[in-house]
A protein has these predicted regions:
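Low-complexity, intrinsically disordered/propeptide-like segments
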Residues: 17-20, 43, 68
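Short alpha-helical segments and helix-capping/turn motifs at coil-helix boundaries
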Residues: 6-7, 33-35, 145-147
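N-terminal segment of the mature soluble domain
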Residues: 47-169, 214, 218, 222, ...
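Short hydrophobic/aromatic-rich motifs at helix boundaries and adjacent loops
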Residues: 7-10, 40-45, 120-121
Length: 271
């Protein structure tokens, strides 16, 4: 629905309500709940294994370990799954081993040390493990059904959550609008927009969540996300804090893939 269509509908509702009130009618609110089914049918699974992730970008955060940890927590409290408590797989190393000898992987030098941010050209002190494009070369591990079937057999054939995670510093410069308090000659306060050129720095988080059937090793569903956060260049925000902030935005969408949701609202009815 476009913004203009939504505005028209709201205007029509207000006109109808005004007309009903003028004619002596009245209206009242009733609660409404809209159920939303999960994106993936997981009725055949009772257990879930957040196995690990192929990671790239900055090495300031162990995104493999932290992503697995942050996804397990809401699954325990907001789903009916039995979450398997297992060591997180070093999936980047496994993907590298399975990629050995492939021309496209050997072209990377076999170690992913590119030393530059492919997204914006920023150079970081510690370099970059793998760029976002490099991670695609390692994604063939998710098509290795026998590998995932073996993992599934080890953990009683659960639903397996895996994928890739790319987390990297990011910067952008440009005009930004801020609100500023001003007072006129009579002392009256008002808020005025102020546009200024600012350098901003932050991080980009781009995970791809892949859901695999532990019984067959086949991929059931893939979901990609991308979030970024920017701060004033003068603000020193730790990488881990930014990572947590970005993951908080993604987790609700991740959970909606596996669990039913209910959207609550109200509806106006005429008597």
């Amino acid at each position: 629905m476009t913004a203009s269509t939504s505005s028209i509908r709201k205007a029509v509702v207000l006109v109808l309500l005004a007309g009903a009130t003028a004619c002596g009618g009245s209206f009242y609110e009733v609660p409404v709940e809209t159920p939303l089914q999960p994106k993936l049918d997981v009725s055949g699974f009772q257990r879930v294994l957040v196995a690990g992730f192929v990671s790239g970008g900055s090495d300031e955060v162990d995104t493999n370990l932290e992503t697995a940890r942050l996804l397990r927590r809401p699954l325990r409290s907001n789903s009916e799954f039995q979450v398997i408590d297992a060591d997180v797989l070093e999936l980047t190393s496994v993907a590298e081993e399975q990629s050995a000898g492939r021309p496209e992987f050997e072209a990377l030098g076999g170690n992913g040390d590119n030393g530059a941010d492919a997204a914006n050209g920023d150079e970081e002190e510690g370099g970059e493990r793998y760029s976002e494009d490099d991670l695609e070369i390692l994604e063939h591990i998710f098509a290795n059904a026998s590998y995932w079937q073996e993992i599934g057999e080890e953990y009683q054939q659960p639903l397996i959550v895996t994928g890739t995670v790319y987390f990297t510093p990011h910067q952008r410069s440009g005009m930004v609008t801020r609100q500023r308090e001003v007072y006129d000659e009579f002392g009256r306060r008002r808020v005025a927009p102020l546009r200024a050129y600012r350098d901003r720095r932050g991080y980009v988080l781009s995970p791809k969540f892949i859901f695999i059937d532990g019984r067959t090793g086949a991929t059931l569903y893939t979901e990609r996300h991308r979030e970024e956060v920017l701060y004033d260049a003068s603000r020193n925000t730790p990488a881990l804090s930014s990572y947590f902030e970005l993951m908080d935005r993604l987790i609700p969408s991740f959970l909606s893939t596996l669990s039913a949701e209910t959207i609550k609202g109200t509806r106006m009815l005429l008597k």
